[in-house]
Amino acid sequence: MKWPVRVKISVGLARGLAWLHHHNKRFRVFHHNISSKCILLDRNFEPKISNFGDAMFMNLMNGELLELGFDKKDVYSFGVVLIELVTGKETINASANSDRTPFSLRDAVDKSLIGLGFDGEIFEFLSIACKCVQSLPEQRPTMLQVYQTMRATGKKHGIVDDH
């Protein structure tokens, strides 16, 4: 799969999760089972999130439930999917590599992507993935932060369009 398609999938997934987590201040959805197996692609490679069987639908009249970190599980799982998109391989234990930031994962980047003019963006996305799979949930960004960073990176490189 070419890099621009992987970017489209990953940014679309980040946008969808950010919407579920942040669209409505009073009502949030936490998927709790994000993996590459629950991401469906339409004919234009737009990702669709499926498998909401373990999802938590929360009415957040106050912010106390966010302190429990329900959103950070989705961030971690998104990071795993992003690593899979960058490496082209299924990830087993991403947190073991997260503290060593891209250096241990650099060698795992799908070799078919290197040298095609996207190397900077590939390693920026890999860095984002490493932040998402930090072992301590409070060190992980929010999905809105992830989406905004990925979108800005993609736009800077001319790959992401506005939705």
Give, region by region, the residue ranges found by the protein language model.
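A structural signal for long alpha-helical coiled-coils and helix-turn connectors
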Residues: A18-H21, R28, R151-G154
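Cytosolic eukaryotic protein kinase-like domains
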Residues: M1-K8, F45-H163
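A broadly tuned "polar low-complexity/structure-edge" signature
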Residues: A18, K25, T87-E90
